[in-house]
Amino acid sequence: MQINIYSIAKKDAKYQALLEELCMQCKQFGVEIKILNLLPQAVLKAQKISSAKAQQSYTQTFLPYIALPTALNLILHPTGHNYDSQSFAKLIESQHIVQFFIGGAFGFEESFVRLGKSVSLSAMTFNHKIAKLVLCEQIYRALSILHSHPYHK
């Protein structure tokens, strides 16, 4: 299984070690996680203009990545479906490619959200750094469940 996490964000060295540790732990289950932080100039400019322009720029940034027809595309969204750890594990089970999309501060255009399955990590709002950590931990937990590893207990 290949898991790709795309985020509108800069790489942050303070969180990188924790992310790398979680990604490394997933390798024991034959899963490779790639995290791609995207913050092109077009996004930086658009965020200064309006929330609508920012959302459009996020869509344009992510479109080349969501176009993969064989992937399960999961879009993190505050109104997305809430999963417990067991059902999240079932969601990603048997998938060859799973892709997660974490938008910028202004969220996603509805047209982009409809291109995948909307998922919420929590009713609370997290910054991108924390959201990525929580997501990676939940991916590791899901893989632990699927492989009967004691981590989940």
From Swiss-Prot:
A single GO molecular-function term is: rRNA (pseudouridine-N3-)-methyltransferase activity
Q: Which residues bind S-adenosyl-L-methionine?
A: 75, 103, 121-126
> What reaction does this catalyse?
pseudouridine(1915) in 23S rRNA + S-adenosyl-L-methionine = N(3)-methylpseudouridine(1915) in 23S rRNA + S-adenosyl-L-homocysteine + H(+)
Q: What is its main location?
A: cytoplasm
EC number(s) recorded for this UniProt protein: 2.1.1.177
Give the subcellular location.
Cytoplasm
Q: Per the record's keyword annotation, is Chaperone included, yes or no?
A: no
Assigned keywords, A-Z: Cytoplasm, Methyltransferase, rRNA processing, S-adenosyl-L-methionine, Transferase
Judged by the first EC level, this protein's enzyme class is: transferase
GO CC, sorted alphabetically, is: cytoplasm
Q: Quaternary structure per UniProt?
A: Homodimer.
PANTHER family reported for this sequence: METHYLTRANSFERASE, RIBOSOMAL RNA LARGE SUBUNIT METHYLTRANSFERASE H
Role of this protein: Specifically methylates the pseudouridine at position 1915 (m3Psi1915) in 23S rRNA.
What family name appears in the similarity comment?
A: Belongs to the RNA methyltransferase RlmH family.
Q: Which HAMAP family match?
A: 23SrRNA_methyltr_H (MF_00658)
- Protein name according to UniProt: Ribosomal RNA large subunit methyltransferase H
Instruction: Report the source organism.
Output: Helicobacter hepaticus (strain ATCC 51449 / 3B1)
Q: What is the lineage of its organism?
A: Bacteria, Pseudomonadati, Campylobacterota, Epsilonproteobacteria, Campylobacterales
